Curated annotation (Swiss-Prot):
GO terms for MF: 3-(3-hydroxyphenyl)propionate hydroxylase activity; FAD binding; NAD binding
Effects seen without this gene: The mutant bacteria is unable to grow on GRA. Only 25% of the resorcinol is degraded compared to wild-type.
Protein name, UniProt field: Probable NADH-specific resorcinol 4-hydroxylase
EC assignment: 1.14.13.220
Xref: Gene3D superfamilies: 3.30.70.2450, FAD/NAD(P)-binding domain
UniProt entry keywords in alphabetical sequence: NAD, Oxidoreductase
Record SUPFAM superfamilies: FAD/NAD(P)-binding domain
Organism name: Rhodococcus jostii (strain RHA1)
Primary role: Single-component hydroxylase that is part of the gamma-resorcylate (GRA) degradation pathway. GRA is initially converted by GRA decarboxylase to resorcinol, which is hydroxylated by resorcinol 4-hydroxylase.
InterPro entries xrefs: FAD-bd, FAD/NAD-bd_sf, PheA/TfdB_FAD_monoxygenase
Record's catalysed reaction(s): resorcinol + NADH + O2 + H(+) = benzene-1,2,4-triol + NAD(+) + H2O
Pfam family, one: FAD_binding_3
Source organism superkingdom: Bacteria
GO biological process, one term: 3-(3-hydroxy)phenylpropionate catabolic process
């Protein structure tokens, strides 16, 4: 049978994009593409939602993505805003006490603790409502075949063993660190060599426990512990295990309760989940092989010490969705080459910082831990605060300059006040301080910008011209433009800045560079047929 031959009686589907895996990354990507009208099928091996928590937190950038999807408010009942976090040593002395920004640069609180089943139920409800998106559960992907044509054929079997075929323009593997798609994408795993065994215990609270820490790292060399809330009425205790620990024995409830006795009793809470985890850090060397792409844990895995694992996967989805949409609309396929070029350095930075942080938090050497404690306590007494961790801007790829996230603050029009994205939208934007800044853009470039869905957002930050369409209600943009010494920015559909301009001439040059980079190819193949 040829690679694209169809078994007798097989079900079949033809779509723009096939997504393998319906965790947060896969569902976010499906929703983003579906909201753009792209036909999508999601193949998931589980027969239903995985109704147990895994990830514990997400940040304001992720909430901004949920805002774009129209589900930010629906996410809130499954979250708690996290105001900060504390490190203590084995003697309960405070080593570090950090406050999170509220709001963060994306207009939402910087850190949310969340109950993942709620998040996934909201995303599932959304993608189920989208007419161009189909999710098929209980599907085991057997192969992903691409030949010299313009399609990829995905072969899967359902729980009854029946064959199902999907012919897609592109396939995205969002099927996790042990997923199947990566073997068809090629490449190798670049392993950082970081391995730690942890026991993760989740509890559902029966009553309020006033002294229960909401986000605490116990840096005790005898047994490092992380204590976090994971949304309303749920709490997680994670214990770093010795390499010699009996991993089958430690999961028994009668072994778990003594570990948490300082904080919880069986009257306080119900133990709902116990799992052994091996935290590791690795990144695949190839995120794209022609029409096969990888996202989320299928492309990279990191330890949880910065709470950026799920967040990084959703960043992947946000980066990839608009590029796939443009390519499917006839823009250069080479846009997809910018995906790994932009995302991999960002992921590597976060992974390396998470490893660095984890090694400090979970020291087992008592002498080194005592030295760490003395240094951190002395710094705290001297009121020396650590620098806030800032993730790097994007570089390379489709970035002219800057490459950082464009902020989101409150803005006003003549009829309403809302967060910036609600007013401006989230396609390509030129954001300018006054209309005169736009005067140098060539008419052809302006037309081409409009044809890719581009819009103009005009403030009156310094010029204060009469009738500015948008007012900087909270001063976010006045401060941002001043800090960057610019008068305009071109913002990408994922919220990252393509480039800053100091004057009208620079803006005209940026517009010309962008239009040339994304110019449609002369022709494109028709959509696949079943």
């Amino acid at each position: 049978m040829s690679a694209f031959a169809q078994p007798p009686g097989a079900g079949r589907k033809a779509v723009d994009v096939a997504i393998v895996g319906s965790g947060p990354t896969g569902m976010a990507l499906a929703a983003l593409l579906g909201c753009q009208g792209r036909s999508v099928v999601v193949l998931e091996r589980y027969t239903g939602l995985y109704n147990l928590p895994r990830a514990a937190a997400f940040d304001d950038e992720t909430m901004r993505t949920f805002q774009k999807l129209g589900v930010a408010e629906k996410m809130l009942p499954g979250t708690n805003v996290q105001r900060g976090y504390v490190w203590v040593n084995g003697d309960d002395e405070v080593l570090l006490d950090i406050e999170f920004d509220n709001p963060g640069r994306c207009g939402w609180p910087a850190q949310y603790m969340m109950y993942q089943p709620h998040l996934e139920s909201v995303l599932d409800e959304l993608i189920t409502s989208l007419p161009t998106v189909e999710i098929r559960r209980g599907m085991t992907v057997e192969s992903v075949d691409q030949q010299d044509g313009d399609d990829v054929l995905v072969r899967a079997t359902d729980v009854e063993g029946s064959a199902y075929l999907v012919r897609a323009r592109y396939v995205v593997g969002c099927d996790g660190g042990n997923g199947v798609v990566r073997q068809f994408a090629g490449g190798e795993l670049d392993d950082y060599g970081f391995f730690e065994n942890w026991l993760v215990c989740d509890f559902q609270l029966n009553r309020d426990v006033p002294d229960l820490p909401t986000f605490r790292q116990v840096c005790d060399p005898a047994e490092p512990i992380a204590i976090v809330n994971i949304g309303p009425r749920f709490h997680r205790f994670s214990f770093r295990l010795e390499s010699a620990a009996n991993r089958e024995e430690v999961v028994h409830p009668d072994k778990v309760w003594p570990r948490v006795a300082t904080y919880l009793t069986p009257e306080d809470a119900e133990l709902v989940r116990v799992a052994n985890y091996t935290f590791r850090s690795c990144i695949t060397t190839q995120w794209r092989h022609r029409r096969i792409l990888l996202a989320g844990d299928a492309a990279h895995q990191m330890p949880p010490f910065l709470a950026q694992g799920m967040v990084s996967g959703i960043r992947d989805a946000r980066n990839l969705a608009w590029k796939l949409d443009m390519v499917l609309a006839g823009h250069p396929d080479s846009l997809l080459d910018t995906y790994q070029a932009e995302r991999e350095p960002h992921v590597r930075y976060i992974t390396e910082k998470a490893i660095e942080l984890g090694r400090v938090q979970t020291m087992r050497d008592t002498a080194l831990a005592a030295q760490r404690d003395a240094q951190m306590i002395a710094a705290r007494k001297a009121n020396q605060k650590p620098d806030k961790l800032r993730y790097p801007a994007l570089s390379g790829g489709l970035i002219a300059n800057h490459g950082d996230m464009f902020p989101q603050g409150l803005v006003s029009t003549s009829s309403t006040t809302a967060l910036f994205d609600e007013i401006a939208g989230t396609g390509w934007l030129v954001v300018a301080d006054g209309p005169q800044v736009l005067s140098g853009i060539a008419e052809g470039d302006r037309t081409a910008f409009t044809e890719i869905g581009g819009k103009e957002v005009i403030f009156g930050l310094t010029s204060m011209f009469d009738g500015a369409p948008v007012s900087d209600t909270a001063g976010v943009y006045t401060r941002w433009f001043a800090a960057h010494e610019c008068v305009a920015a071109i913002v990408r559909p994922d919220g990252y800045v393509f480039g800053l301009a100091r004057d009208a001439a620079e803006l005209a040059g940026l517009a010309k560079e962008l239009v040339a980079a994304v110019a449609p190819v002369p022709s494109r193949p028709p959509a696949p047929t079943a």
